[in-house]
């Protein structure tokens, strides 16, 4: 794309327009600045609310992929890529899933998480190459993230995923973008002009984080990773999480702390299994077998 074409493209983007509410923000004091930022941030949940049907559809596709052995793969550049990596990295400790079940890829690789990598987002071929490096297949779901909706790196990845007949999702902040036209499901969280013109790490980034939270949380709930609203598959890998596992067992069963701790010990610190043991009266092996028959869904296992 020529410089002139790029300038014209940017001029048409909602995220690149100037915000009338912050036009003189450099004349304000600290309290006034943060008030404007906070006021603008209030528009973000509403923008995400308009996308709920598309988000729910994406969740259904992700769950179908998980049940068939597929993965959820996020890909993005800059802030968008970092948010994808962040959401993916939280899934193993929160839900006890393998680290490759939800994958985050950022343009420029690991170094780009902390340092800007010049030109990384401009290479569509690298987007495809990074998917090839993780052996992306038609069983997987690709979620491309870019506020602009035009990032070449992400577009390259989406086109490659489409060529494999994989499900593709685009999360953008500009309606009718190139990514929207490629993806099977378009989540267009249009938050309007940023407080600082073009700084899409702000409202656009916040909207992206809310959407990513929904995608993984809803998918994991449907996969049986929660009981009521408790994270029963949490990995008790540190002192805080071990204490949380005890509380989860106590809350789910209304048992004492001593019973929760003793049952967790017998259940190898598996909170879901411990809850099954307490509520069903079954021993570890039998409780585990019942859970397996119900694909790890505790509520269904208890209802048998």
UniProtKB/Swiss-Prot annotation:
Every SIS domain range: 62-225
Pathway: Amino-sugar metabolism; 1,6-anhydro-N-acetylmuramate degradation; Amino-sugar metabolism; N-acetylmuramate degradation; Cell wall biogenesis; peptidoglycan recycling
Entry's EC annotation: 4.2.1.126
Keyword flag Lyase: yes
Molecular function GO labels: carbohydrate derivative binding; carbon-oxygen lyase activity; ether hydrolase activity
UniProtKB keywords: Carbohydrate metabolism, Lyase
Catalysed reactions listed for this entry: N-acetyl-D-muramate 6-phosphate + H2O = N-acetyl-D-glucosamine 6-phosphate + (R)-lactate
Active site per the UniProt annotation: 90 (proton donor), 121
InterPro entries: Etherase_MurQ, MURQ/GCKR, SIS_dom, SIS_dom_sf
Pfam families in UniProt: GKRP-like_C (PF20741), GKRP_SIS_N (PF22645)
Quaternary structure, from the entry: Homodimer.
Annotated function: Specifically catalyzes the cleavage of the D-lactyl ether substituent of MurNAc 6-phosphate, producing GlcNAc 6-phosphate and D-lactate. Together with AnmK, is also required for the utilization of anhydro-N-acetylmuramic acid (anhMurNAc) either imported from the medium or derived from its own cell wall murein, and thus plays a role in cell wall recycling.
Family: Belongs to the GCKR-like family. MurNAc-6-P etherase subfamily.
The name this protein goes by in its record: N-acetylmuramic acid 6-phosphate etherase
Gene source species: Actinobacillus succinogenes (strain ATCC 55618 / DSM 22257 / CCUG 43843 / 130Z)
This protein's encoding gene: murQ
